[in-house]
Amino acid sequence: MGLRWKQFGAAAFLLLALVFAAFVLVRGWSTLEGLGGPAESGGWRVSPRWLLAGLGLGTANLLGMAALWVWLARRFGERIEYLEGIPAWLGANLGRYIPGKVWQLAGLAAYMRGRGHSSSVAVLSALALQIVVLVTGLLAAALALGGRMGEAFGGSVLVPILMATGLLLLLHPAILRRSTAWLARLLREDSADGPAGEGTGRGREGAPRGGETLLIGLATLAAWWLYGVGLWCIAAGLLEDPIGDPLTLMGIYAASYVVGYLALISPGGLVVREGAMILLLATVLSVPAGVGAVLAVAARVWAIACELSAFGVAMLLRYAAGLEGPTDPEAKGAP
């Protein structure tokens, strides 16, 4: 009965996350329509082929990021199949749009525990991946924009440099192992007596090593590049006159994402991310405010559409593979 209630709670969270994400998507599209035509925004139109290309790139990118999280969870010792873990991460990711910054991780932990997995490993691997995303986002912005990235951080380049340094320290294997044990004790799991996986029978590989962390960082940096290409496709699909190039748009998108993520009072970085993007578009590419507003709001609509699309694809693949119920041997009662 306890497991059923946990599964019910995870399903309720997912439904709530989908509702909030859909609400933000509809509101974003309404805002985009309200920006009007040439007089207000400098002119915009819809080119389906470019928009579909951007949607495809963003969807594939998110599926790749979800697979990277599953790899991290397995590296920490959790036995989880990719076709189970990918939709779990993508579904929990939608929790960012629920007011309050804890729902993304709380939803992932509840789902994993409901499926008979370690919620502490799920949370720690998600946090580790998020740190990598933030660090590589700052690096992508620095590579593409140079000192101009400081415009999104109050005009100072020192702020993102110090932030990246502090985040990198948190990825040290020893810190990750101790964090796993602490989270396990906090969540009252059996793995509290050792590094990740020890005492649970889920594996003893432990935290990723330095070389593996570097590979994860390179993969995430490639994901930022794909986001830049995707945003360029969205711009080509909406604006009368093309702006920028994929590399510059990668830096603008990455910097605005980091700023939005750090906005603790804003679900999913709403408004804050768009404001940072409009500012950077104006500063770096001399884009008028009206055109920048169109692209910033379109980028939000695109991001949510990609999240919903990736989750839908992952769920279809999961059900096509016939994955039902807990996959952990102990949760199934297998010998």
Model-derived features with residue positions:
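Predominantly cytoplasmic-facing regulatory/coupling regions of multi-pass membrane proteins
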Residues: 1-90, 137, 143-262, 284-335
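A generic structured-segment signal
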Residues: 81-84, 92-97, 104-108, 121, ...
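Membrane-interface alpha-helices at helix entry/exit sites of multi-pass transporters
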Residues: 82-87, 101-104, 113-130, 287-298
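Transmembrane alpha-helix interface/packing and boundary motifs in multi-pass membrane proteins
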Residues: 91-98, 254-274
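Mid-bilayer segments of alpha-helical transmembrane spans in multi-pass integral membrane proteins
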Residues: 93-102, 130-138
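Re-entrant/interfacial helical elements at transmembrane boundaries that shape
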Residues: 102-115, 265-283
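Short alpha-helical linear motifs
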Residues: 108-112, 130-132, 145-152, 272-278, ...
